[in-house]
Amino acid sequence: MKKLISHILIALTGMLAVSCNAWLDVTPENAIADDDLFSTGFGYRNALNGIYTNLASDELYGKQLSWGFLSAISQQYNQKAGTISPMYADASELIYNTVDTEPVVTAIWEKGYKVIANLNKLIENIRPTDISLFEYGEEEKNLIYAEALSLRAMMHFDLLRLFAPATATNPSGAYLPYRDKYEAAVVEKCTVTDFIEKVLKDLLEAEDILRKFDTEYHPEAMYASQMYEPTPEWNARYRFNSGSYIDDMGAFFWYRGIRFNYLALLGLKARVCIYAGPAYYKNAETAAKELYNTYYQQKRWIGFTEGENITCNLNSRYTKVSHDILFGLYKKQLATDYEQAVWGSSSSSSTTRLPLANIPSLFASDNTGVYTDYRLTYLIGTTNETQSKYYTLKYNPCLLYTSPSPRD
């Protein structure tokens, strides 16, 4: 349980020491006329899918908020290696105002709030819309609405962690706005405490809807429902690689692993409450226990990746350790983009441009000096270089993610 909860509750403690006043006025993009986009239920589906695509962009979770800028400021890369780019070197030193880092920081802020603007537009339009517009009526309308609320909470929370001090430092400080309306006007900044309350309010409104859909209305997409004895491995396959398992409802209601689902909500709620401080710890415990007791111990919808899936041949290895992933965004070219960033244009290069720092000092060896930790021996690659020796295998393509996404 400790390992699972640590995965759920981990939060980046660093903050970006930049002024964001100049970026508060972010005008929403409106590429398609509202009357056209929101005139059908399929238009709402397309709008939500477009938001997921934007979340997976390079500026956000497709790069900078996963293996890019965020990994650099959390000291994962060896900034002393001569192969690392100036941007990652500066970010690793927590220097945010250089010619290399400042554009990245600005793009994260602007793209994050543009995604929020699009979510607000979707939320405001779907609220008064009659359920008859949707193929699956109230359930479909509510699902789209709840996912949009949850994504708005998630995006705001990550912007808070990046652009404001930790809650314990100054909870009454006001650093950035919580935008819950679709408008171009500058919005007053919230205190950290009020900001977190707004995050939790969005999650609370979405919680019962997602719970009902994922555990009662259509649980078939959350676990290996067609198997006599489902395992965490096959449950993960159903969520992330639905493929031939899709029923008559269609792909939009499957692939729940790459859509914000009820398990993801419980995990995010626990993280937010831990970040918020002692007054919220009980709520964090409640969410984490439900996730662990119900969906790990009882239903086994999630679990730990078996050793045989890690120690096998690299081409078959589950380097994402995927059986307990609650939610992930789909990006078709992720492996290609990461390979290009690590090795450059030369397929024969043996020098990584994103070398991991402090390896193998992070892992213990046995009394003979041999390292037996699977994370080091099977999930981290090595080169013959000294300062650029180690690199992650996490983004190596694995069998679990080879089938096409519904948005291909």
Language-model segments: which ranges?
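Bacterial Sec-dependent N-terminal signal peptides
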Residues: 1-29
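Membrane-proximal, proline-rich intrinsically disordered regions
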Residues: 20-74, 331
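Aromatic-residue-lined binding/catalytic grooves and analogous aromatic/hydrophobic interfacial grooves
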Residues: 21, 262-263, 268-302
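Conserved, well-structured interaction surfaces
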Residues: 45, 53, 85-163, 183-197, ...
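Elongated scaffold/linker segments in the mid-to-C-terminal portions of large proteins
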Residues: 100-103, 212, 222, 228-234, ...
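Short coil/turn linking the two alpha-helices of tandem helical-hairpin repeats
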Residues: 160-161, 167, 275-278
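A short, hydrophobic C-terminal helix/tail in secreted or cell-surface proteins
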Residues: 404-408
